[in-house]
Amino acid sequence: MATLHRQNAAGRRKVQVSYVIRDEVEKYNRNGVNALQLDPALNRLFTAGRDSIIRIWSVNQHKQDPYIASMEHHTDWVNDIILCCNGKTLISASSDTTVKVWNAHKGFCMSTLRTHKDYVKALAYAKDKELVASAGLDRQIFLWDVNTLTALTASNNTVTTSSLSGNKDSIYSLAMNQTGTVIISGSTEKVLRVWDPRTCAKLMKLKGHTDNVKSLLLNRDGTQCLSGSSDGTIRLWSLGQQRCIATYRVHDEGVWALQVNEAFTHIYSGGRDRKIYCTDLRNPDMRVLICEEKAPVLRMELDRSADPPQSIWVSTTKSFVNKWSLKAMHNFRASGDYDNDCSAPLTPLCTQPEQVIKGGTSIVQCHILNDKRHILTKDTNNSVAFWDVLKACKGEDLGKVDFDEEVKKRFKMVYVPNWFSVDLKTGMLTITLDESDCFAAWVAAKDAGFTSPDGSDPKLNLGGLLLQALLEFWPRTHINPMEEEENELNHVNGEQESRIQKGNGYFQVPPHTPVIFGEAGGRTLFRLLCRDSGGETESMLLNETVPQWVIDITVDKNMPKFNKIPFYLQPHSSSGAKTLKKDRLSASDMLQVRKVMEHVYEKIINLDTESQATSSSANDKPGEQEKEEDVSVMAEEKIELMCLDQVLDPNMDLRTVKHFIWKSGGDLTIHYRQKST
């Protein structure tokens, strides 16, 4: 399903095109999991990934494969999710600046809210009122009526929202009580700000933390609040007294995640130190170390299907999600066998999780090879892979080889200008094309491994070819060579479709490839799958979103001009020849040194008078190819070219000479001399 941010084209910032190289079905979390929501009625767990994907899992332990489905629409980290309407609706918040409304049972996106101007980091939910709040780095808090959101349609797509102002810094945490009478935000301002969401009135500001407030919880009636901070403390606040009434120093490092039981008497905490504790709020010395994760804890979700809770789900910066049993803790608590010495190290009650939702690997390192087409990557499992940027696919799994050695092994003395950028934020390869350099790279078809139908070796623009492949299914990009009258006839004969030219004629990208149009600042305007661009709705939205620089290439077929490189050609000092007038020459940066040698041979050295005399008319005579080959062979036998006294390989092109040998600013200077016989 496509998403679009409608906006006046004149007011739009520069638009980039991105795409993700990935499998059609990404079954496993590729990166850390930022948020969890449990639906005990359906035995389903929702995970919100840093790979931009929300996944649904069965928590039925008898099921061998827990994966149910993926919910894909976001283009950046999903930072928070909330289940509403008794599990029928899911709300998500993302670093792509959007809040999305999903049908949780069927797994599709119903609507997208684009009110935020920066990363959306936190959501809060008032269950009794079906009210949701969203907040993020733009310092804004917006209130949403869930029943209104779920009623949105293509024609009825206007929604009003209330906003809470007053935050001075980026918001990282949010909490609202079930009855929707109090809402609290935590931020890098290190204070808690409190509002009444019914009137949007500011109620108070609570000071005490010395670092970012990462997690917040409110009791049912909105009289008490728990906060976890990067300063390593958990604080209990009385809103009636407008002050902190208890501070819990349980963790060695920042506290990033909190859960509390229904009675608001026991708090579960986790964070940077990877440990998960349960602390009795009435007696802080009664703390239990439940378990220790293998990575910093990002989120926890209590299984509230029983009271007291029998298990807790935990996600971390790694891709695995673990379910830890709390039964041993309840038995331990009943025994009263606490270690009241808070300075003494505690032994975890659980050493193995009760259930594990396995995760996948995340790409953590990459190297763009010199051909500016292939990329080497290393993932969290230390496995190395070889990727084809142009065809948007993995070329080869190389296994656990030495990454640096593999880079050295694949080095070629060839220079191609940069024409794309790579991002690994989601754990997958995201390639971005920008108008400023997308068309910088030209290559010969044969060098790129492509053959032309007519046997020629045309010059190909990599960025142009890729854009044509990404939008191959968009009808507006198709070429129909027939005249209108013939079109009508062919349509009747059923031949029209076969005559339409699609794509670039050389290669295709996988049809499931996500294509993203976004502002340079990161805001997504439109996301769709490559294969869906032929749909009526998607095609219409593409008309409104695709920038002119992409239209020029894909629709109008106006390929950019070749890159020119200026250079000087002079006799080498060892040749004894008189230095020529310093004329500034210019040629395509892909011109091979061999062609410059031919120029020197024919025009300057003048070894073959006949060749020189006929060179101007050679193109019009039979045997042109044979004569060109003769000249090339003679030139290589008689002439050598040098740059900074290094003899040049005839197969090199000018841009490679400039990049690897000349290496400095100013115009390239090439010297020539006759080979000694």
From Swiss-Prot:
WD repeat intervals: 28-67, 73-112, 115-154, 166-205, 208-247, 250-289, 292-334, 358-397
Pfam (any one): WD40
Region (Disordered): 611-632
Domain of life the protein comes from: Eukaryota
Compartments (UniProt record): Nucleus; Cytoplasm; Lysosome; Late endosome
InterPro entries in the record: G-protein_beta_WD-40_rep (IPR020472), WD40/YVTN_repeat-like_dom_sf (IPR015943), WD40_repeat_CS (IPR019775), WD40_repeat_dom_sf (IPR036322), WD40_rpt (IPR001680), WDR48 (IPR051246), WDR48/Bun107 (IPR021772)
Biological process terms in GO annotation: DNA damage response; double-strand break repair via homologous recombination; positive regulation of double-strand break repair via homologous recombination
Any GO MF annotation of the entry: DNA binding
One GO CC annotation: nucleus
Coiled coil, from the record: none
SMART domains hit by this protein: WD40
Assigned keywords, A-Z: Cytoplasm, DNA damage, DNA repair, DNA-binding, Endosome, Lysosome, Nucleus, Repeat, Ubl conjugation pathway, WD repeat
Family: Belongs to the WD repeat WDR48 family.
Function according to Swiss-Prot or TrEMBL: Regulator of deubiquitinating complexes, which acts as a strong activator of usp1, usp12 and usp46. Enhances the usp1-mediated deubiquitination of fancd2; usp1 being almost inactive by itself. Activates deubiquitination by increasing the catalytic turnover without increasing the affinity of deubiquitinating enzymes for the substrate. Also activates deubiquitinating activity of complexes containing usp12. Together with rad51ap1, promotes DNA repair by stimulating rad51-mediated homologous recombination. Binds single-stranded DNA (ssDNA) and double-stranded DNA (dsDNA).
Entry remark concerning the domains of this protein: The WD repeats are required for the interaction with deubiquitinating enzymes USP1, USP12 and USP46.
Name assigned to this protein: WD repeat-containing protein 48
Gene: wdr48
